[in-house]
Amino acid sequence: MKEILITNDDGYESEGLKKLIKMLTKEFKAKITIVAPASEKSACSHSITLTKPLRFVKVGKRFYKLDDGTPADCVYLALHALYKKRLPDLVISGINKGANVGEDITYSGTCAGAMEAVLQGIPAIALSQFYKKSEKELDYKNALQITKKIIQNIFDKGFPLEKKEFLNINFPAKSKIKGIKICKAGKRVYNFEAHSNVNPRGVEYYWLAAANLDFEDEKNSDIALLKKGYATITPIMLDLTAYEKMKKVKKWLKANDE
């Protein structure tokens, strides 16, 4: 029997997580363990908690919330504390409410859950559902169908990537999808804002906000294809070295020494 570990960054009560658990329980004869944050941890990136203790709080059969933990905490602790004899065959992070594309991947707690898994040597996928602000309720039907297909492929054929690589998967908002595209991550155009105010005691404070987020116009990027109605799959590697720039930096350093 296969073993699956699930986490997310929207918290243990999120709708995307509930839908995913229901589908996996119905479609796969697998031993499923869920460890999710006790509260929303969106944009927490790959942070882990080093300054205070963490504790599992059981909320169901093999279902735990991690008290004030991040997605990376959830995966790290689950692998070290809950799996004594055999590690999971797959880690799934999601389904996130909102896309994780372009450089957003570096901020994403959802993607960080998958990153932590592959750092520990476990195949992983990150799942995110794109939606429009006008949508009152998210439809996860397509996301669940595609996720089922991908997991079945992984179990039948093995994971398609090397160590320290994961699949970042995004699902379009449209009810009728055009298909699945393997693509690169796009490039964000960022316009951050910091809104200041003063509390009743006269102390200034700030709310961070990301306003008017947009992307560079690239035909085959994840965001462009997602907007056109395609589900996107982007292989992500944790090796951040810009190999093609190494000679340039050596030349630059040598020139500075002259």
UniProtKB/Swiss-Prot annotation:
Keywords: Cytoplasm, Hydrolase, Metal-binding, Nucleotide-binding. Its cofactor is a divalent metal cation. GO terms for molecular function: 3'-nucleotidase activity; 5'-nucleotidase activity; exopolyphosphatase activity; metal ion binding; nucleotide binding. Its main location: cytoplasm. It catalyses: a ribonucleoside 5'-phosphate + H2O = a ribonucleoside + phosphate. GO terms for cellular component: cytoplasm. It holds the Pfam family SurE. Binds 1 divalent metal cation per subunit. A divalent metal cation binds at D9, D10, S42, N96. Gene3D superfamilies: Survival protein SurE-like phosphatase/nucleotidase (3.40.1210.10). The keyword Phosphoprotein does not apply. It comes from the Bacteria. It is found in: Cytoplasm. Its EC number is 3.1.3.5. InterPro entries: SurE, SurE-like_Pase/nucleotidase, SurE-like_sf. Belongs to the SurE nucleotidase family. Nucleotidase that shows phosphatase activity on nucleoside 5'-monophosphates. This is 5'-nucleotidase SurE. It comes from Campylobacter jejuni subsp. jejuni serotype O:6 (strain 81116 / NCTC 11828). The gene is surE.
